[in-house]
Swiss-Prot record:
Homotetramer. Belongs to the cysteine synthase/cystathionine beta-synthase family. PROSITE patterns: CYS_SYNTHASE. Its EC number is 2.6.99.3, 2.5.1.47. InterPro entries: Cys_synth (IPR005856), Cys_Synth/Cystath_Beta-Synth (IPR050214), CysK (IPR005859), P-phosphate_BS (IPR001216), TrpB-like_PALP (IPR001926), TrpB-like_PALP_sf (IPR036052). Pyridoxal 5'-phosphate binds at residues 73, 177-181, 265. This is O-ureido-L-serine synthase. It comes from Streptomyces lavendulae. The modification N6-(pyridoxal phosphate)lysine is found at residue 43. Keywords: Amino-acid biosynthesis, Antibiotic biosynthesis, Cysteine biosynthesis, Pyridoxal phosphate, Transferase. Changing residue 121 to M: KM for OAS is 44 mM, KM for H(2)S is 0.20 mM.
Length: 324
């Protein structure tokens, strides 16, 4: 193991793991586990790329403040990168997102400006713009910044291509969020592995790409209420929707059956991959992105109905044999 000069040097090179119990036997379903990034999500890549790009262009200097509208993961990642690079960070975030996200941002020294969640990302971006203009802060502009998909072309896509070099890969499944992963990886697959079908998913009650419709939903991190500027629609082969209950239940299954604790959007990508795999030809290979860890959803509907007390009834049942 090498010695690293900065925690930021550990971003990327996340593992790809085969599902052993959830996938149909006639297929192979793999997942790219982005929670292995130091900030716990794929958004570490975006945050680092935006900051390095801004530094190279002379848009950031030590002590400056970065501000961004975020559903949480980008905010956590930017707060981490800002701490490591000597900047301040302010997150503009809807009040419907999990409290874990707020606490993690504050743990990295960031500040929070909350707004009513029903305004969606569009409303939050307007607030972030106003703050940036008023105080002279740097706007990361994750939805429009070309550094976002560029970094995914250079790192995420390169990692996938290296890991599947000389191996079969039929489907790549990812969610509709900032679309940095979708666009960056999709563009590279188009060139290097054109046989791979790129599958984009969005919540069934917030199908901006499929129907131009949006309503508040519980798959945090997916589906802003607008179409990001960095999106390259031409990379999408299949556009599907996923209901939030199936996403939640699949996330729970990932932890209980595979030992992989991932967030609700990860449940959505895996549920989509499993649905495709169910009817796919023998030997089909699929890869689904797992954007983050489930630990930042402990206060959300991911854990609705989960008992927080002692399992005394189960323990007592062992004496009668009914708990075995």
């Amino acid at each position: 193991m090498p010695l690293f000069n900065s925690i930021l040097d550990t971003i990327g090179r996340t593992p790809i793991v085969r599902l052993q119990r959830m996938a149909p036997e006639h297929t192979s379903v793999y997942v790219k586990v982005e929670s292995f990034n130091p900030g716990g999500s794929v958004k570490d890549r975006l945050a680092l790329s935006v900051v390095l790009d801004a530094e190279a262009k002379g848009l950031l200097k030590p002590g400056d403040t970065i501000v961004e509208c975020t559903s949480g993961n980008v905010g956590i990642a930017l707060a981490m990168v800002a701490a490591a690079r000597g900047y301040r960070f302010v997150a503009v975030m809807g009040d419907t997102y999990s409290v874990e996200r707020r606490k993690l941002i504050r743990a990295y020294g960031g500040k929070l400006v909350l707004f009513p969640g029903h305004l969606g990302s569009k409303g939050g971006n307007l607030i972030a713009d106003e703050l940036a203009e008023k105080y002279g802060w740097f706007r990361a502009r994750q939805f429009d910044n070309p550094a976002n998909p560029s970094y995914h072309r250079e790192t995420t896509a390169s990692e996938i291509l290296a890991d599947f070099a000389g191996k079969r890969l039929d489907h790549f499944v990812t969610g509709f969020g900032t679309t940095g992963t979708l666009t960056g990886v999709g563009q590279m697959l188009r060139v290097a592995r054109p046989e791979v079908r790129v599958v984009a998913l969005e919540p069934s009650n917030a199908a901006m790409l499929a129907r131009g419709e949006w309503s508040p939903h519980q798959i945090q991190g997916l589906a802003p209420n607008f179409v990001p500027g960095v999106l390259d629609r031409s990379v999408i082969d299949d556009l599907v929707t996923m209901d939030e209950v199936t996403a939640r239940d699949t996330s729970r299954r990932l932890a209980a059956e595979e030992g992989i604790f991932a967030g609700i959007s990860a449940g959505a990508t895996v549920a989509t991959a499993l649905s495709i795999a169910e009817h796919a030809p023998e030997g089909t290979v699929l890869l689904a992105m797992l954007p983050d860890t489930g630990e930042r959803y402990l206060s959300t509907f991911l854990f609705d109905g989960v008992d927080e007390g002692s399992d005394d009834a189960w323990l007592a049942s062992l004496d009668t044999g009914s708990g075995l």
